[in-house]
Regions:
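PLD/PLD-like phosphodiesterase catalytic module centered on the HKD motif
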Residues: 1-174
Length: 174
């Protein structure tokens, strides 16, 4: 087991070293950002597939009745994080968003499958790359990869390298 503190060693650096041609990546997280894709673009181009589960209902048709909407919190923030979270504003202002979005969309069509947790059950975020497991992972963003600080006092991620551990998490996708 390894502890990644996202200061001295980042999840991004570890993923750059750990993702190889033919790797299979599975992610359960609250959001997906094109800027996180950009940080790992070279490595992600070589993978066989990415399976992603949004841990909260995202990009799904709402079925809530009008009476339940009295305390409704809009899901727009989860879905808009696709184009960057509040901590990725600096990158967004480089006017490269359209190009990154097109590259990411093309990659998603070729390599990725996205699903959403539509149950009322909580899901913990995690990521597996072949036999390595990273947990907890909140979102697939530059903050979670350790590229940006965000508003976290700390963001420690545990990495385990065991077929049994990774297989347990991978089975959650089936």
């Amino acid at each position: 087991m390894q502890i990644i503190d996202n200061i001295n060693k980042t999840v991004k650096d570890d993923l750059k070293a750990g993702i190889h041609k033919g790797s299979k990546v599975s992610v359960a997280a609250a959001c997906f950002s094109i800027y996180a894709y950009q940080e790992l673009k070279k490595q992600l181009e070589g993978i066989d597939e990415l399976r992603f589960i949004f841990t909260s209902p995202t990009f799904v048709t709402e079925k809530a009745s009008k009476a339940q909407r009295e305390f409704y919190i809009p899901r727009i923030s989860r879905e808009s994080s696709l184009y960057g979270t509040e901590f990725e504003v600096k990158l967004r202002n480089e006017l490269t968003q359209k190009a990154i979005a097109k590259e990411c969309a093309d990659w998603i069509k070729r390599k990725a499958v996205f699903k959403s947790n539509v149950t009322q059950e909580q899901m913990m975020g995690f990521m597996t790359v072949d036999e390595s497991t990273y947990a907890p992972i909140s979102g697939f963003t530059t903050v979670d990869l350790g590229c940006e600080r965000g508003n976290n006092a700390y963001y420690t991620v545990m990495k385990t390298e065991s077929f049994e551990n990774a297989n347990h998490y991978i089975k959650l996708f089936e």
